[in-house]
Amino acid sequence: MKLYDLMTDNRRENILVGSKKPVFGWRVETEKRNVRQESYRVQVWDEQGNSVWDSGTVESSRMAGIQYEGKELQSGKRMTWHVSCTFSSDEGAMTAEEESSFETAYYNRKDWKGRFIGETTDYEYHLYRKKFSCKKAVKLAKLYVCGMGAFECWINGERVSDHVMEPGWTDFRKTCFYTAYDVTEYFAEGENLENIILVKLGDCMFNVPGGRYVYFQRSYGKAKFLCQLELVYEDDSREYVVTDESWKRAKSPIEFCCIYGGEDFDGRRWTKEYLNSDTSEIWEAAVCVEPPLGELKPAPMEPLKIKEIYQPVSVREVETGVWQYDLGKNFSGWARIFLKTDGRKAGQKVVLKTAEKLDENGRIDQSVTGKDYAWTYILNEEREQEFAPDFTYTGFRYVEMTWAVPEKEITLQGEFIYPDIDQAGDFFCSNTLFNQIHEIVLQAIKSNTKSYFTDCPHREKLGWLEQTHLIGPSIMYNLDVHNLYTKIEGDMADSQRENGLIPDICPEYVTGFDKWHKGFLDSPEWGSACVLAPWYAYKRYGDLALLEKYFPVMKKYVEYLSSKTHHEVLHHGLGDWLDIGPCTPHSQNTPVPVVATCIYYYDLQIMAKIAQLLGKKEVAEAYQKKMKLVFEEYNLQFLDDQTGRYANGSQAAQAMSLIVGLVPEEYQDKVVSQLKDDVVKRGYAITAGDVGHPFLIAALMKYGMSDVLNEMTNITNKPGYGYQVVNGATTLTEEWDGPEPGNIHGSQNHLMLGSIEEWFYGSLGGMELVRDGLPFEEIRIQPHPEKSVDWVNAWTMHPYGKINVKWKKENEKTRVFCQIPPGLTAHLESPDGKEIMIVGSGYYEYEI
């Protein structure tokens, strides 16, 4: 038995902890059955070995969310923590212990000893350099950088990390992230050796120029950065190298940089000769500038990285000097080129343009994703050169490269960028179509996971909030997004208005959409993410601290919604956006008040549960009283008690009413029957839109209609997932018929319709983890074998470890195998809900 994956604030050791009350967690590795933690003891020491907290022996089974309760943590310190646990099992008592460490952040602005330096002219870019010598042998070196909008950094010619587009996107008026690195390895042994720090700046979302395609123009100021290198010498003395007027700057190779328009890069200013020169013609004194408005905080989420590389599946010359590369899949990121020249091509340009699709002539089509998006590289004299953009990305599959030299002298690869987060699950089954659907949904999720969940990786790149809760359960099956959800809740808190409103987009980079429809600013289905997203994070990760920290934000928003009701019903918002019908994209099948009030009631229900968890009994009772009023008025206005239809009986109206708990018990059967009849009579076609779709899936699962979902997911005509697969989609598209042959339309890379993962994992795989209603340390294993599936293998990660369910049909029976991690209790149930047995950790095999 051993402990592993020791976490501080949900990340492994050597992370930068921004909280003064971090939370700890761990997992247990053992082959023994029914292992359960009986007690733990957490101890924390500072750099000098002084104890700052000792929890003492705590009798608890809890292995996640253990909050620090010791002395106040100090800035910029390396802390060590140790956990020792006792366990019970079928084979008796056991013990295990392990140690980890973490770094505390700079908690105060005064901890930064330097000043911001940066650009003095809009959309002009420089390289920044500092030369210095170490007075003594270096024992430890830590580098802290806040770069607005984004930066890359080198020490002595070595890139200090493989992170990209750091430090992340926020409302820069409120919050500016910084990052930290252990850079000890970049300093050679010995004293008085010259060292060089080099920083490259770009704009990203901080400063968005025009000039090419741009979805919006907005500026939080000119590019700037703050840097602090902390050197700890062998004798424990310290020295700091910080940004000030002593730094030098030179014209950057970046000539144009726009998150929406692309990047132009002059390789002649990215050579050893240029970078190492000391002439005043190239290098001039840096300029100190005003700091950004936002509070400096360590980035709480994992950094972006190049996570996958795609090689071209085909290359063809589409016209003289223009080469088209097909990378086989739609994804988000950039292309990297490798050139070999005779050394006499300096000044020549290579232009790269991208697209998700081809037009009728077989050429790239940027009509949806942003016309004229491009990367341009100007060659230098070196014989071997390499280029990829630094501070922009897009969604694409095809690249057209314009260069007069034969293709054999240049190679190209696609680089898929998303956060450096753990894969949290996967799903496989005997049904090839289902596997393909899972693949395109997962590809869209990864493509749109950046500093927040984007709607698409090209046209808008905005944080439309509804996605965070509508497909939150589906995302959480696949990726560990715990820290990203923490960051996004911070975005919502930063964007909240005085009256409590949470705008639809956070960070709120774009304003003015409400001139077309007020719902683009204020829609309950979007703003309610501030309540529902952290609740799902609590259900999935057990993060009570997140609920406690942001409870005032949630409360203020729900009060705002209450102020907008008329007879307890809400009447504003976008409703069931992009539902199926002739009047898309606006809600046409379901009245807006039905959709908005369902979400409002769901908010009240969740807030009552959160208040109870936080010990706010009177607040919980107030929400429960409000729920009763909304329940009565909603059913008075919308329920036809003769037919069991809500409003016009749409799929969204029926499903949402069921899932949020607005259906009186005596009418449940009628409401369920109406829902099933509507789906079946339409040939298992979907009519629900962005908002209603996940509730439709959840309702069919909850009320014993997994077989209906099986039929819906197997069809290959529109609207449906299968239609996208058979028509060549490699990522989930914005509209159900997006890849229509001869009329490919809309974004070909959207994640908002990806809720089918809930059925794949939760019903076929039998692992319902968010909507199950069970306590955090209990799970239900209830697979539903369907006629189109012969076997399933699905797994997902719980904070305590891996849950794996496999099943295979054998004659008239289905044999189930499951793996339960230590610390969990599993209810093994048949498809009809009969309990087979209750088990602890271990491997189990049984028949259903």
Could you tell me what each predicted segment is?
Residues 217, 226-228, 241-274, 298-303, ...:
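Non-catalytic C-terminal accessory modules of carbohydrate-active enzymes
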Residues 508-512, 518-542:
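Charged, long alpha-helical assembly modules
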Residues 151, 160-162, 492, 509-510, ...:
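Active/binding-pocket-proximal capping segment
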Residues 150, 242-251, 398, 409-440, ...:
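Active-site acid/base region of carbohydrate-active enzymes
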Residues 1-459, 466-467, 483-486, 499, ...:
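Extracellular/oxidizing-compartment recognition motifs
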Residues 141, 155, 334-344, 349-354, ...:
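Alpha-helical support elements that line or immediately flank enzyme active sites
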Residues 197, 265-266, 271, 460, ...:
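C-terminal capping/lid segments that line or modulate ligand- or cofactor-binding pockets
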